[in-house]
Design a protein with these regions (language model features):
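Key DNA-contact positions within bacterial/archaeal DNA-binding proteins
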Residues: 37
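Alpha-helical residues within the helix-turn-helix
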Residues: 30, 47
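Alpha-helical residues within helix-turn-helix
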Residues: 26-27
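Minor-groove-contacting beta-hairpin "wing" of winged helix-turn-helix DNA-binding domains
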Residues: 53-66
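Extreme N-terminal segment that seeds HTH/winged-HTH DNA-binding domains in transcriptional regulators
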Residues: 1-23
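Conserved segment of winged-helix/HTH DNA-binding domains
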Residues: 67-72
C-alpha cells in the first residue's frame, strides 16, 4: 500500500465518522474495501491525530465525541 492510499483510507473513514454512517466494523471494512483489522488500524490513526472516537451500539456507527477537523 502506498502512503497516498493510506491517507485516502483515513480521509474516507473520517467522512463516514463525520456523517455518522460507518455501520459496524465489518460493514465499514466492506465499504472501504479493507480488512476489519485495517479498520481498527485506521481508527487508531485518527485517534493518534487527536480524534476522540466512540461506537454507538444503538445507531451502529462510530462518531466523534468532540468536533474534529481532519487536516492532512
Amino acid at each position: 500500500m502506498t502512503f497516498k492510499e493510506h491517507l485516502l483510507q483515513v480521509k474516507r473513514l473520517h467522512e463516514f465518522i463525520r456523517t455518522k454512517s460507518t455501520g459496524t466494523p465489518e460493514t465499514l471494512a466492506k465499504r472501504l474495501e479493507i480488512s476489519r483489522a485495517t479498520v481498527f488500524r485506521r481508527l487508531d490513526d485518527l485517534k493518534n491525530l487527536g480524534a476522540e472516537i466512540e461506537f454507538d451500539r444503538d445507531r451502529m456507527t462510530y462518531y466523534y465525541t468532540e468536533p474534529y477537523d481532519l487536516r492532512l
